[in-house]
């Protein structure tokens, strides 16, 4: 009979199994849930931003830095491979950090494993927004990945890009190489392909996955599973040009919207007529006020004798 497993052996096997699952799921972890892309609130200016070594807005250092690799805020001496040996049971704050990543601009703890592996496996190595072309060092927000083309997006453009990225610009769902119906759609090239034309000599199909796009190599999806419109939408921050100081916002979008809505001359003529009518009404109101003041001046010197309003009427009643 096999030997009975001890408690320490069971714990070691469970730990190895958990580490194996973590290594397998590390490549499929969501970018928004990665420690180097976590949400952080500055202790000084109270502004929310991406996890950073220094605040993007006020350059202050956080009281509890978060490791960009393991996500911990406290280094335990017994259970960690510390490069810098520290006195006491644990260390926090600047005593826990060991480096700053050049790609994600976040602290890395002084653990040997984090220091040696994070720079090579940082998910924000080439993180540049596909819409505004800003990197991690150019804005304070978090970085996201498009669900359709899997390009990097900043926090300002993520919703608008994904809303327009799922739109097919073609008027038909037919294959681009023939007239047959395309069963596979590439969301990066915005094109459909049939079964025969998805086969490519350059990009090989992996086992258990959809065939790659013959143009860009991006994984295709079945057209029947997609709910896409054939209209292309133009809206959001990137529709207008940048301003003089290099900042672009929603001002150009609202200006274009208002100009399209009220651009005809008939609207401006009606608006001028309304302004003239309002001016005439104001002049009439002023004339009425002047006439009221003149009539009140005429009756100021009029004496009606002792009346109830003057307070002397009760004397006349007693005399009678």
UniProtKB/Swiss-Prot annotation:
The UniProt regions of compositional bias labelled Basic and acidic residues, in chain numbering, are: 10-22, 216-225
| GO MF annotation terms | metal ion binding; zinc ion binding
PANTHER family linked:
ZINC FINGER PROTEIN 330
Q: Please provide one cellular component term from the Gene Ontology annotations of this protein.
A: ciliary basal body
The record's similarity note reads: Belongs to the NOA36 family.
Q: Where are the zinc fingers (C4-type)?
A: 42-58, 67-104, 129-149, 175-189
Report what the protein is called: Zinc finger protein 330
Q: Does the keyword Nucleus apply?
A: yes
PTM Phosphoserine: at which residues? Answer: 291
User: According to its UniProt record, where is this protein mainly located?
Assistant: nucleus
* Record organism: Homo sapiens (Human)
Q: Which superkingdom does the taxonomy of this entry point to?
A: Eukaryota
The protein's matches in Pfam families, at most eight in alphabetical order, are given as: NOA36
Map out region (Disordered) in residue numbers.
Answer: 1-23, 206-320
> Which keywords does UniProt give here?
Centromere, Chromosome, Metal-binding, Nucleus, Phosphoprotein, Repeat, Zinc, Zinc-finger
Q: Where in the cell is it found?
A: Nucleus; Nucleus, Nucleolus; Chromosome, Centromere
